[in-house]
């Protein structure tokens, strides 16, 4: 009953309100009803009921199982930068691949669709080969000039009165005990360098095991090869390539009469980081840098400097670099020294890298890579050494570099060679920051110091172990090709580079870019031989072309190997 009365009262109040609003003088009129007493009673009853409900609700509680989010920004700038940079790199990679495939596809289609177009395509296919032929002619011309003409008025070069001090650098990663022992032994047995003060610096990048190894490379060196020595750990050794501090283990002693310093890095940061460590240390040691910011912890820097002083080295003149899978010929260091002494303007010299056949001279893998070394790396380095004086790749497995501003200064090591790519850098910059550190170093000081010159010592032979299976071979060639092509592409547009080097760099990049087209052209030649071999054998133009190609490809091998003695006597 109470609820019925309440509803009736609310309806009447609503009607009264409507009537009052509709009245033209609603402000002066008062609405009254006989049921006003019922309204008052109903209101009191309703008020009493709501008061009871509020009293019950005040005693209730609400319990949930939710949890609040952590206090943090809605997005992480570092993560977003890395994600965006990774996406941009993928876009660049796929754009390059699609572009190269499109270009090669068009060339292949033109070559097969329009046979007369070979007047154009032959230029692309033979550009690199033509330059190889030009290199051989230039080498022979310079050899004739040097060997026959200039001997009449050649001046004697003043030799240094005191023997140059040498530091042997051996960067390692995951080499086994046999490789490490062979490399160190080849340094110890070097001939005709006895008067020179010598010091061995071994840097191990991380503490890892290679395939089939029972110990890490650091353990092999410390426990089995170098023997006992004074050991010390520096928790804050130096600032690594990525900008963070690197803990290092240090041991020094004597290895077969030569003082050594072992530096074991806790984490793997790459060979470039190890090279920056050694080169920057020697540069600042020679300068006796004071009040200068370096990558080194002061305690570590002073500790290593003390070891050099105790070894009788007031100053380090030359740094000889090699790889832990390489062995030097017993006259290697001496031959590189002779080239440097003959031309004091040289900043660095590299040796002649040969394949280590390891008792199997007829192995297919070794024979092919030996021929490849001669036709590609050896020929170009000989041309650069004798004609331009700018060997653009000083192989890390055999090099001798002067410790000076042009080679090891902060401008080179910290801003160019030691540059750590940012996540949003271009793809070529990322590649150059990882691969081909040998080319990166030479190109950097050629660009910043255009008058710097380098050379190759053909008699300074180093023997390196080459891959013996497809997996390792393709992995190595991937690193080499990506690094070399990126450096050659940028070298073509950098200041301070000779015009002939720019042209050679562009030809190298173009030859790499049309590799699928080259393979298709070779396949087309094979098909033509199969279909119409009789006609080709009787065609003078075809025979002449094949003979010329054979001469150009075989001659580098002959020049650098069969006539090696003659060339080294000349140069």
Question: What annotation goes with each model-predicted range?
Answer:
Residues 107-119, 123, 504-571:
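Membrane-embedded multi-pass helical conduit in multi-pass membrane proteins
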Residues 133-140, 403, 519, 523, ...:
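Alpha-helical transmembrane segments of polytopic integral membrane proteins
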Residues 1-6, 10-24, 29-36, 43-51, ...:
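Non-transmembrane catalytic domains and loops of membrane-associated enzymes and transporters
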Residues 66, 88-89, 113-118, 129-131:
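Non-catalytic localization/regulatory regions flanking kinase domains
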Residues 84, 99-101, 110:
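Charge-rich interaction surfaces and accessory domains that mediate macromolecular binding and assembly
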Residues 123-150:
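Transmembrane alpha-helices and immediately adjacent membrane-cytoplasm interface residues
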Residues 100-103, 571:
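Alpha-helical transmembrane segments and immediately adjacent membrane-interfacial amphipathic helices
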Residues 90-100, 511-515:
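Select subsegments of transmembrane alpha-helices in polytopic membrane proteins
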